[in-house]
Design a protein with these regions (language model features):
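A structural boundary/capping signal
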Residues: 1-122
Length: 122
C-alpha cells in the first residue's frame, strides 16, 4: 500500500506543479483543479497505476443529502475492492456537509468522507 501512496502522491504533485506553472490556464477541466476533476483525474491515475502494474477499479458515488433530489457526485479508485485511492478529495475542504475533507491524497480503507457517497459504479 505504501508504494501505491507514493505513486498517487507523485501523480498529484505533478498535477499541482503543472497548475502552478500555468499549464492548465486554457483548459476547461483542469484550470480549477481539484474542483470538478475527480472523474477525469481518476481515469488518468488509473492508467498511470496500470502502467506501473497496479490494477484499479473506478468508483463513482453520489451524496443525496439534499431534500431537493439533487446530489453531489465524487469519483475515486479502488484496489482489491478495499483500498481507496483519492487524489481530489480536497475539493470539498471548504464544505462542512462533506466534513471539510482536506486530504489531497488519500490511500486507505473506507473513511467517513467516502461513506457519505452512495456508490453507483465499481
Amino acid at each position: 500500500m505504501k508504494n501505491i501512496e507514493q505513486l498517487a502522491t507523485k501523480f498529484r504533485k505533478a498535477i499541482d506543479m503543472a497548475l502552478e506553472a500555468g499549464e492548465f490556464a486554457g483548459d476547461s477541466i483542469y484550470r480549477r483543479f481539484p474542483r470538478a476533476c475527480c472523474g477525469d483525474t481518476s481515469d488518468l491515475l488509473a492508467q498511470y497505476l496500470l502502467d506501473k502494474g497496479i490494477k484499479t477499479d473506478y468508483v463513482c458515488g453520489t451524496y443525496r443529502g439534499k431534500t431537493d433530489g439533487n446530489g453531489q457526485s465524487h469519483a475515486w479508485l479502488m484496489v482489491d475492492k478495499c483500498i481507496i485511492i483519492d487524489i481530489t478529495g480536497d475539493q470539498f475542504s471548504s464544505r462542512s456537509t462533506f466534513l471539510n475533507y482536506n486530504k489531497s491524497v488519500y490511500v486507505g480503507q473506507g473513511d467517513d468522507f467516502h461513506r457519505l457517497f452512495e456508490v453507483e459504479d465499481r
